[in-house]
Amino acid sequence: MVIKISRKYLVIAGSILLLLSCKKPKDPCSKRGFEYSSSIFHCWYGPSTDSVPLGSIMMLEGSVPRAFTDEYTNSKVTNTSSILNGPLGVGMILPNYQAAIDSFEITAEVGKVIKDTINLSAGQLKGVRTIEWDCSSIDSFKMRLKIKPLAKGIYSFALKQQSSVDKDCALYKYFLQPGNTNQHLNYWMDAFGSVSSSVAFYTYCFKVY
């Protein structure tokens, strides 16, 4: 009788082990395809004047929270990613409309400035650098750039969509508008006659004399 009971328990135990071994592993990308966005945050350019001397130092800085309210679902989300990055576009408006990253020396005091030769073409790199934010804070991402003009002209800067993929593969997108009282878009208007909604949202203009 003891032997029969033991065999019965062995069969049950074996069945349990088999079920456990066949259990589907947890999907590490349970939120693949999910996107969360916010466009209420700002970046700041300094000094806020519409013109700066050649060789002077300008600053671009920003801070965005890990936790925010998604503007589409109105739900509270938290970004636990260890990377947040995105493009900074630099263009000359006058005297010639062209990509103009080489007209500035851009270095990071907080975060990183990356010449991304893997994901960007040689043509794109003439006007774009990838900004990688500092992610060491438990509640926010931060960046601060030092910008030194190397050539005279009228320029536009645009910090475009900054994004990251969380550990569960959800995509978090931050859209930052310059928080300065005046973005000096009159320079753009004078050159092109109109300002699109995208330019009005992202762009900050100034003159280097």
Language model features with spans:
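C-terminal motif of bacterial Sec signal peptides marking the signal peptidase cleavage site
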Residues: L19-S21
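Extracellular Ig-like/FN3 beta-sandwich strand-entry sites
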Residues: G55-I57, L150-S156
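Acidic/polar, low-complexity intrinsically disordered N-terminal segments immediately downstream
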Residues: P25-Y97, W188, Y209
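Short, flexible loop/turn segments at beta-strand junctions in immunoglobulin-like
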Residues: S51, I147-P149
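Bacterial N-terminal signal peptides that target proteins for export
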Residues: V2-V11
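Glycine-rich, aromatic-bearing surface loops/beta-hairpins
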Residues: L145, Y155-Y209
